[in-house]
């Protein structure tokens, strides 16, 4: 008689799971209450807690729950206590008043399998190594002085993007521009030139003719979107650790696959960069600086190659996906609200004219366009839920007891749609930021009504770069082209696709018509 090993295995798994479930259920029933005065929230179920309530769009589900339970609510997600802040006052309490207590992040499957076991800057433990990584980025890439130093790179790469779009618009039958691909093309090469001193990505159709390219932009864009999607998923194993090894959703498997692809790409970049190091001896780029940091002890800390790769992964993914998604949403809103696009064109024509490209120095003189950017950050924040934080110690927030090791989620999407803060929050109305009430609100983390980059000491390190890139690239696209939908398309599909970054479910395609002289579309 033969024995079916696979059947025995699954029966064993089922038996162990049943035992653990029964054990946990009994503990749940008879465990004494030490809840003090926790924030209100849904009860959930034994073992799984409130996980099923999150659905496929957790930011929307959590916003709906906050209407019932309040702006500070407590959920048990599996075995993990989680507090959710859903209005500006609650966000300020956690991200400013109690910022130090929530300065670390939980180490889950995402940081483990995608970010080299949290050896990057985004997920690293709050401490000396995180501070060194952040300092290096600020000094050489993301700080105000660094942004000035590489402003010419931004102008040049936007020029390459405009050239590609102009060529597509000039064909006998204009080809619709796939907006996210063009944005990734510009932003990834912008970051590549700062880090590597070269343009690592090309339009897919031109890959064979480019000897220096590391990858096609469409391939890279797919990898970035997959990584950001997976990193935003609620993995059951993160919240019920004793079944994590089963990988019931297949998320860990998929994370390992996409991380391997990035690792191959990053290793290739570093190898090629090392081989040409002598050419940059007198003018080192950011990767040269990082590699030097692996050979020296800086402030008692020494980086290693894993830290370098993990940081490059942060910069190439977050540096392209978050800003490009905001720009895509803004263009989608303007295509659905033609009067907003027309008013932006009128303002730009009055201030800039139509004989040259927009410059960064023009933006302060374009208040209506700036209002469009802010309104997009409000309604379509690049990160709908902040990356989770975790409390180091128990604390009291607004009269509620928050236990030690409680996860914190700030629902940035819900804050931007809070009807107590924003009149008609579901409408796309840039004019609201021209009123005295909201005119001085800035998206860089100081006004908790609008925190698309987060706030506090773990605010997005690229907030300054992200805000400036959105303004400059979106402004250039609006000023340089007229925009219309492809034939047969009446309205832009505005459905969301959830992840760390909030993408459009259907990528935006549009027909563009040049508004400036042909010389404006050359590099």
Swiss-Prot record:
In its UniProt record, which GO terms are filed under biological process? Answer: anthocyanin-containing compound biosynthetic process
Cofactor names from the entry are: heme
Which Pfam families does this UniProt record tie to the protein?
A: p450 (PF00067)
PROSITE patterns per record? CYTOCHROME_P450
Kindly tell me the pathway this chain contributes to: Pigment biosynthesis; anthocyanin biosynthesis
Q: CDD domains from the xrefs?
A: CYP75
Q: Which UniProt keywords apply?
A: Heme, Iron, Metal-binding, Monooxygenase, NADP, Oxidoreductase
Q: Which residues bind heme?
A: 460
Source organism, top-level taxon: Eukaryota
The UniProt catalytic activity note for this protein reads:
a 3',5'-unsubstituted flavanone + 2 reduced [NADPH--hemoprotein reductase] + 2 O2 = a 3',5'-dihydroxyflavanone + 2 oxidized [NADPH--hemoprotein reductase] + 2 H2O + 2 H(+)
Family note: Belongs to the cytochrome P450 family.
**Described function:** Catalyzes the 3'5'-hydroxylation of naringenin and eriodictyol to form 5,7,3,'4',5'-pentahydroxyflavanone and 3',5'-hydroxylation of dihydrokaempferol and dihydroquercetin to form dihydromyricetin.
**The protein's name in its UniProt record:** Flavonoid 3',5'-hydroxylase
Q: Which organism is it from?
A: Campanula medium (Canterbury bells)
Question: Gene of origin?
Answer: CYP75A6
């Amino acid at each position: 008689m033969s024995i079916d090993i696979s059947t025995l295995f699954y029966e064993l798994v089922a038996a162990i799971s049943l035992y653990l479930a029964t054990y946990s259920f009994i503990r749940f029933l008879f465990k004494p209450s030490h809840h003090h005065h926790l924030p209100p929230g849904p009860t959930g179920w034994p073992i799984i807690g409130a996980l099923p309530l999150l659905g496929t769009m957790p930011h929307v589900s959590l916003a709906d729950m906050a209407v019932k339970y309040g702006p500070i609510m407590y959920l048990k997600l599996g075995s993990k206590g989680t507090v959710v802040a859903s209005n500006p006052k609650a966000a300020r309490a956690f991200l400013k008043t109690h910022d130090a207590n929530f300065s670390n992040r939980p180490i889950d499957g995402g940081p483990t399998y995608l970010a080299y076991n949290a050896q990057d800057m985004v997920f690293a433990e709050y401490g000396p190594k995180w501070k060194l990584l952040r300092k290096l980025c600020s000094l050489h890439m993301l700080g105000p002085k660094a942004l000035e130093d590489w402003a010419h790179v931004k102008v040049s790469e936007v020029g390459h993007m405009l050239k590609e779009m102009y060529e597509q618009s000039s064909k006998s039958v204009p080809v619709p521009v796939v907006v996210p691909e063009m944005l990734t093309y510009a932003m990834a090469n912008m970051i590549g030139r700062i880090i590597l001193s070269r343009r690592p990505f090309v339009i897919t159709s031109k890959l064979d003719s480019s000897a220096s390219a590391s990858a096609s932009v469409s391939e890279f864009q797919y990898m970035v979107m997959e990584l950001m999607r997976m990193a935003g998923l609620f993995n059951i194993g993160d919240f019920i650790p004793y079944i994590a090894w089963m990988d019931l959703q297949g998320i860990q498997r998929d994370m390992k696959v996409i991380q391997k692809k990035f690792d191959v790409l990053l290793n290739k970049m570093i190898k090629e960069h090392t081989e040409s190091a002598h050419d940059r001896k007198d003018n080192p780029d950011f990767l040269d600086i990082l590699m030097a940091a692996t050979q020296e002890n800086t402030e008692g800390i020494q980086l290693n190659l894993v830290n370098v790769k993990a940081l490059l992964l942060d910069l190439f993914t977050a540096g392209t996906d978050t800003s490009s998604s905001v720009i895509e949403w803004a263009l989608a809103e303007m295509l659905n609200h033609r009067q907003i696009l027309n008013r932006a064109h009128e303002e730009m024509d009055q201030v800039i004219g139509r004989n040259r490209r927009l410059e960064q120095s023009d933006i302060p003189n374009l208040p209506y366009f700036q209002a469009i950017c802010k309104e997009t950050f409000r309604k379509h924040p690049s990160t709908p839920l902040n990356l989770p934080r975790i409390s180091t110690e128990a604390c009291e927030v607004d009269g509620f007891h928050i236990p030690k090791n409680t996860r914190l989620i700030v629902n940035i999407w819900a804050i931007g749609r809070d009807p107590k803060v924003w009149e008609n929050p579901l409408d796309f109305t840039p004019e609201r930021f021209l009123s005295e009430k909201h005119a001085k609100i800035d998206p860089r983390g100081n006004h908790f009504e609008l925190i698309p980059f987060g706030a506090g000491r773990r605010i997005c390190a690229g907030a300054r770069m992200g805000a400036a890139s959105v303004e400059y690239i979106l402004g250039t696209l609006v000023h340089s082209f007229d925009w219309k939908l492809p034939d047969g398309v009446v309205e832009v599909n505005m459905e969301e696709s959830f992840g760390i970054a909030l993408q459009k479910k259907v990528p935006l395609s549009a027909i563009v018509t040049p508004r400036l002289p042909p010389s404006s579309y050359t590099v």
